[in-house]
Amino acid sequence: MPVTKTVKMLVAEAKEQTNSISPADAHDRQHSGDAILIDIRDIRELQRDGRIEGAFHAPRGMLEFWADPDSPYHKEIFATESELVLFCASSWRSALAAKTLQDMGFSNIRDMDGGFTAWKTASLPITKDD
């Protein structure tokens, strides 16, 4: 069966329908208390590449379940009025995730442009597991 909509097309649509934020602005908003950073990367990526201090890890496969207040897996961090800034390695998965949370009714969602890779390129602080 031929693919009629590629992942690039899905990501492009998601990016058109969601708000984004630069890594520098995400850093500033996190440190001013106006935003919570949500890291949706796989745990192996965090272990290999490091993490953003203070970011909440919500694996992409659990995101909807953790965000839904009616789910038995709900995490209270998603019941906030603060802005939630999602990121992955390059902002493809996080764009799709931001679109999904918007579809669920969240209005306080942003996708971090370029993801963790752009954060590191901007020389913003990261921590590494020992």
What are the residue ranges of the model-derived segments?
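Short, surface-exposed ligand- or partner-binding patches at beta-edge/loop junctions that are enriched
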Residues: 87
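Active-site flanking residues adjacent to catalytic metal/cofactor-binding acidic residues
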Residues: 38
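Rhodanese-like catalytic fold shared by cysteine-dependent sulfurtransferases
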Residues: 1-35, 43-83, 92-130
